[in-house]
């Protein structure tokens, strides 16, 4: 299974026999031992706790998304609510993020690697936390730096517009990025 949340739901809803039938594996061919009821209860309890954490995460993401709609809609549109919140956190405030050049926005979150580069001459970081953006994730490894530079540029523009309460240009910025790298 690819999705951890779905896996937890399957554990909560079905027993071992149902799961084996679903994936078309016989009881003899399956790995592992049969668990007694006393061992199954802690596993199910843990699965419930994990499920509750997933639900809490969704709730928090919804809250952050709503908050970002009001505070900085352009940054949210360009990079998503969670990444926008992390960038503002690393910068210290929306004001500080808006004052940063794109090159600094690009390596936010990679300060340790930057100082290692300055101290020892190691390779400089190409990106910080913006590596989590889908455009960078989908790009080939050798294009990560180029995509990160363009993305940081658009984020820096969006931050300036949001801080100085200009008009909404997030869609235009995102469209430019998708046209170039999408």
State where each predicted segment sits.
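Extended compositionally biased segments used for macromolecular assembly or nucleic-acid engagement
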Residues: 1-35, 42
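Phosphate-backbone recognition surface of nucleic-acid-processing proteins
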Residues: 89-163
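Long, well-ordered mid-to-C-terminal structural blocks that present hydrophobic/aromatic surfaces
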Residues: 65-97, 102-105
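Intrinsically disordered or highly flexible coil/loop and linker segments, enriched in small
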Residues: 59, 161-168
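Long, highly charged low-complexity segments enriched in Glu/Asp and Lys/Arg with interspersed Ser/Thr
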Residues: 166-182
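DEDD superfamily 3′-5′ metal-dependent exonuclease/proofreading module
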Residues: 8-10, 34-37, 47, 51-54, ...
């Amino acid at each position: 299974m690819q999705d951890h949340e779905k896996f937890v739901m399957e554990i909560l809803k079905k027993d071992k026999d149902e799961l084996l039938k679903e994936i078309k594996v016989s009881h003899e061919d399956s790995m592992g031992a049969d668990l007694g009821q006393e061992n199954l209860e802690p596993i199910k309890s843990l699965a419930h706790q994990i499920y509750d954490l997933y639900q809490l995460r969704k709730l928090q993401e919804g809250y952050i998304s709503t908050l970002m709609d009001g505070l900085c809609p352009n940054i949210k549109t360009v990079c998503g609510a969670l990444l926008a919140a992390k960038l503002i956190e690393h910068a210290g405030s929306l004001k500080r993020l808006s004052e940063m050049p794109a090159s600094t926005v690009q390596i936010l979150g990679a300060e340790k690697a930057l100082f290692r580069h300055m101290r020892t001459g190691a390779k400089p970081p190409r990106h910080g936390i913006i590596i989590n953006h889908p455009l960078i994730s989908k790009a080939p490894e050798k294009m990560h730096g180029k995509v990160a530079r363009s993305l940081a540029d658009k984020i820096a523009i969006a931050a300036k517009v949001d801080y100085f309460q200009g008009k909404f240009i997030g869609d235009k910025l995102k469209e430019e990025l998708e046209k170039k790298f999408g």
